[in-house]
Swiss-Prot record:
It comes from the Bacteria. The gene is marR. It comes from Salmonella typhimurium (strain LT2 / SGSC1412 / ATCC 700720). This is Multiple antibiotic resistance protein MarR. The keyword Transcription regulation applies. Residues 11-144 form the HTH marR-type domain. Coiled coil: none annotated. SUPFAM superfamilies: Winged helix' DNA-binding domain. The lineage of its organism: Bacteria, Pseudomonadati, Pseudomonadota, Gammaproteobacteria, Enterobacterales.
Length: 144
């Protein structure tokens, strides 16, 4: 009898490969970011908030494709670190908006500068320049 993992790999081999590459990227990113006391997941949340300016947790959940409960806990941790603030939502008396603090913007900028080219080289070290270009082209074709 085949395991669930084996069945999953047979049904969605490309999806599994993309997932595994994403996991590798996150592990590498965590290694690069650890001296700044931030995880890859926290970095993604901060970047999404930075791009939006101010955003509701529900909108952020959709952007990141994560569970709202997990996102709320993440936002609580970022709030404790002083990297975000919660503001009343003027369009919804019960809701809030999240926004980067100056410290949050600064850590986001530091994170952008830190891994950059090193991360790209580590991810693609077994590929030729032509293979990297082809991979980027094909992945962009998959996206809408």
């Amino acid at each position: 009898m085949k395991s669930t993992s084996d069945l999953f790999n047979e049904i969605i081999p490309l999806g599994r490969l993309i997932y595994m590459v994403n996991q590798k990227k996150d592990r590498l990113l965590n290694n690069y970011l650890s001296p700044l006391d931030i995880t890859a997941t926290q970095f993604k949340v901060l970047c999404s908030i930075r791009c939006a300016g101010c955003i509701t947790p529900v909108e952020l959940k959709k952007v990141l494709s994560v569970d709202l409960g997990a996102l709320t806990r993440m936002l609580d941790r970022l709030l404790c670190k002083g990297w975000i603030e919660r503001l009343p939502n003027p369009n919804d008396k019960r809701g809030v908006l999240v926004k980067l603090t100056p410290d949050g913007a600064a850590i986001c900028e530091q994170c952008h500068q830190r891994p950059g080219q090193d991360l790209h080289q580590e991810l693609t070290k077994n590929l030729t320049a032509d293979e990297v270009a082809t991979l980027e082209y094909l992945l962009k074709k998959i996206l809408p």
